[in-house]
UniProtKB/Swiss-Prot annotation:
Role played: Plays a major role in the shutoff of the host protein expression by cleaving mRNAs probably via an endonuclease activity. This host shutoff allows the virus to escape from the host antiviral response. Hijacks host RNA splicing machinery to selectively target host RNAs containing introns for destruction. This may explain the preferential degradation of RNAs that have undergone co- or post-transcriptional processing.
UniProt family annotation: Belongs to the influenza viruses PA-X family.
Keyword Phosphoprotein: no
Active site (UniProt): E80, D108
Protein name as annotated: Protein PA-X
Domain of life: Viruses
Organism this protein belongs to: Influenza A virus (strain A/Malaysia:Malaya/302/1954 H1N1)
GO molecular function list: RNA binding
Subcellular location(s) per record: Host cytoplasm; Host nucleus
Keywords from the named record: Decay of host mRNAs by virus, Eukaryotic host gene expression shutoff by virus, Host cytoplasm, Host gene expression shutoff by virus, Host mRNA suppression by virus, Host nucleus, Host-virus interaction
Amino acid sequence: MEDFVRQCFNPMIVELAEKAMKEYGENLKIETNKFAAICTHLEVCFMYSDFHFINEQGESIIVELDDPNALLKHRFEIIEGRDRTMAWTVVNSICNTTGAEKPKFLPDLYDYKENRFIEIGVTRREVHIYYLEKANKIKSEKTHIHIFSFTGEEMATKADYTLDEESRARIKTRLFTIRQEMASRGLWDSFVSPREAKKQLKKDLKSQEQCAGSLTKVSRRTSPALRILEPMWMDSNRTATLRASFLKCPKK
């Protein structure tokens, strides 16, 4: 699973996930499913904010990243992916500026158009079950909840999906692709089932032992986007390029 994550996701997302797990004292070598889940959640949060800006009239517009109008205000503030101290600093700043009620738990995004915090969920189960779990945990009508599944289903507070249909379709397509890629490698069942995950962990550890000593150093590029958490969209060409840059365990 760890190899899959490093091949499938943008290196910046992988690095953020590694930092998050380290902050909470979690071992990504052991909790590989959580590693994959965090990377998936991060990417969905970035895609959610992708290309969405607010113009001078306060209207929400969609602009490509290479458009000169990209200097307009981002519609969404990304909170997910920051260390806890910085994340709460951002939340406090938003609350002081907008008058929004401070949430009890760290949300994932803030929507400057609708003036509300957003909690993003990505689930391998039924969307309505996960939605209820989120709602019971947050216990606040002020925080908007939006849940996506790997099967293309979604659920949001008061059926308000925030984004246009095309933007949501990109997220659903990406999640479905991740599921298909996992399935093709025999990883999906272990990603869904804890029992299967234990079996897969044993296979992963055995595979790592076989690969020990065969890896060479891979250069890491640090993008400015990592520091400012700019949104990104992993198109097929970019994914193919990233995959080519990573090493695989040599076939014997």
